[in-house]
């Protein structure tokens, strides 16, 4: 089989196939010649739980992640728009590490390791390979790929083609599969050869001691304001990645599409970061921007024995770093389809079902971002949204992946109604959060909303480490639905207590209708112990 693209998605797909099919012939065609540089200029440095579990456990790379990359100190959110001081705004994050690790990955180091591992596993990795044409076979006919290398063109035949060509999107372009997400956002980003430590921005010992480890720099730090957020991601090579992601209508790209313009923009919206970059004399090692970076793909798996993974197919939004997650999910389905095909099974029904499942995961995750950038202007609504989104992610999608149930169609059928109920509740919660941010007064208290101090939240994260039998898995998915219902009721109850008219909002009514199985909640899910 041929994998088009030797980056993160392509190499992990090849390694996944090798682990499942040790005798299969696999070749990876990579346009770049030679090794990737450290701190390579790619988005996708921050992983979350599914991606980290996929790399570490599914592919067996945990020791490499621990030794060569940085354990992430979770996500951290500062409502710091137009503030000169980081320690006088709301902070949402953890004061200590939770049970399930995730990592800040230096893509150059990681992709070079993946390439070495692939070669040692008997996978042919061909560098300097430029794809000139793809002729897709149908029925049992082989696909043919024309590849230029060293001024010669070679035609390679393969039963399977897996497109992992990144934003080049070779198959998507060829087959006209592109579709809009309705999420018009832009991004600029650059890397600087210095460590950016937000702890250095404060002299307040009480603020510094909020966290057990003075390692806020290890977090994916989000500096947040109306219609935008800024990322700070550390890399093990000593660089720091800085990015601005913004709603296109609120913050036009032409105001930040060069390093000088980005610095001018930061001086207005995140002055403390701009000051830190100036004080460190931080010269960018690179700079890039993407207009309308979010996109979809109408089809990613085909009964004609081709598939698409990574950015060659879909890209949502980097706010919660889902890129590696969707590589993991797509690769899992692709590997199972290839395995079934090579075993002589009819894959058509599985292609249909896996496509529906992947589409469902993609669409439900998109709701976390689309139309939600206005929530960032409201610290209170933001803090609730973050908790809700985590609960939905850990309680539903993570459970499916960590329990190895993505391809267990029998079990997915048994929990179908609970999954649909959880998705419908999330679909109703996102408009409620949007309305809460738009129509209630914002407050930006000087507090740490410590997610690690919420016992149920800590337990939900820890639950990912516990392997379950069938009965236990069904119970877990049901418990996740009940937890989401309880959280929805508490979100509404707290808002109504502050303003009774919120009970009449259509968004409130719609959300509570989805949580109708629970008439009351104990009111403690959002009861943070506050650290000022």
Which residues make up each language-model segment?
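FAD/FMN-dependent oxidoreductases across multiple families
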Residues: 226-230, 234-236, 250-337, 341-373
């Amino acid at each position: 089989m041929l994998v088009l693209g030797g980056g993160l998605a392509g190499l992990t797909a090849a390694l996944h196939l090798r682990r499942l099919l040790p005798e299969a012939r696999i070749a990876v065609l990579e346009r770049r010649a030679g090794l990737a540089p450290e701190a390579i200029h790619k988005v996708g440095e921050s992983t979350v739980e599914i991606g980290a579990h996929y790399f570490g456990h599914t592919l067996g790379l945990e020791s490499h992640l621990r030794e060569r990359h940085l354990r992430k100190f979770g996500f951290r959110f500062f409502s710091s728009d137009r503030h000169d001081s980081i320690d006088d705004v709301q902070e949402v994050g953890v004061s200590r590490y939770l049970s399930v690790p995730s990592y800040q990955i230096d893509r150059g180091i990681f992709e070079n390791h993946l390439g070495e591992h692939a070669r040692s596993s008997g996978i042919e990795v061909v560098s300097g390979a430029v794809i000139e044409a793809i002729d897709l076979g149908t029925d049992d006919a082989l696909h043919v790929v024309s590849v230029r290398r060293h001024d010669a063109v070679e035609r390679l035949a393969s039963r399977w083609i897996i497109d992992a060509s990144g934003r080049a999107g070779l198959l998507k372009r060829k087959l006209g599969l592109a579709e809009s997400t309705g999420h018009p956002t832009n991004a600029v980003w650059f890397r600087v050869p210095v460590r950016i430590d937000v702890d250095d921005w404060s002299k307040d010992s009480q603020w510094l001691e909020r966290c057990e480890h003075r390692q806020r720099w290890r977090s994916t730090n989000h500096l947040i304001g109306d219609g935008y957020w800024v990322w700070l991601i550390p890399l093990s090579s000593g660089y720091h990645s800085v990015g601005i992601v913004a709603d296109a209508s609120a913050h036009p790209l032409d105001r930040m599409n060069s390093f000088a313009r980005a610095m001018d923009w930061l001086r207005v919206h995140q002055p403390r970061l701009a000051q830190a970059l100036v004080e460190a004399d931080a010269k960018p090692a690179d700079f890039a921007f993407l207009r309308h970076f979010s996109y979809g793909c109408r089809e990613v798996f085909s009964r004609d024995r081709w598939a698409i993974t990574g950015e060659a197919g879909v890209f949502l939004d980097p706010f919660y770093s889902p890129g590696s997650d969707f590589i993991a999910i797509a690769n899992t389905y692709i590997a199972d389809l290839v395995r079934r095909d090579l075993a002589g099974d009819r894959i058509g029904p599985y292609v249909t079902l896996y496509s529906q499942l992947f589409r469902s995961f993609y669409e439900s995750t998109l709701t976390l971002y689309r139309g939600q950038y206005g929530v960032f202007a409201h610290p209170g609504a933001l803090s609730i949204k973050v908790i809700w989104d985590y609960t939905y992610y850990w309680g539903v999608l993570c459970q499916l992946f960590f329990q190895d149930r993505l391809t267990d169609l029998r079990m997915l059928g048994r929990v179908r109604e609970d999954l649909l109920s959880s998705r419908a509740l999330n679909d109703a919660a996102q408009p409620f959060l949007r309305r809460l941010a738009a129509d209630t007064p914002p407050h930006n208290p000087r507090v740490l909303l410590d997610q690690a101090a919420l016992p149920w939240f800590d337990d939900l994260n820890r639950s990912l480490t516990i392997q379950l039998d069938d009965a236990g898995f069904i119970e877990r998915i049901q418990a996740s639905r009940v937890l989401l219902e309880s959280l929805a009721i508490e979100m509404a109850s707290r808002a109504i207590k502050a303003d009774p008219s919120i009970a009449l909002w259509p968004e409130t009514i719609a959300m509570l209708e989805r949580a109708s199985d629970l008439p009351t909640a104990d009111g403690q899910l959002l009861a943070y112990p506050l650290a000022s």
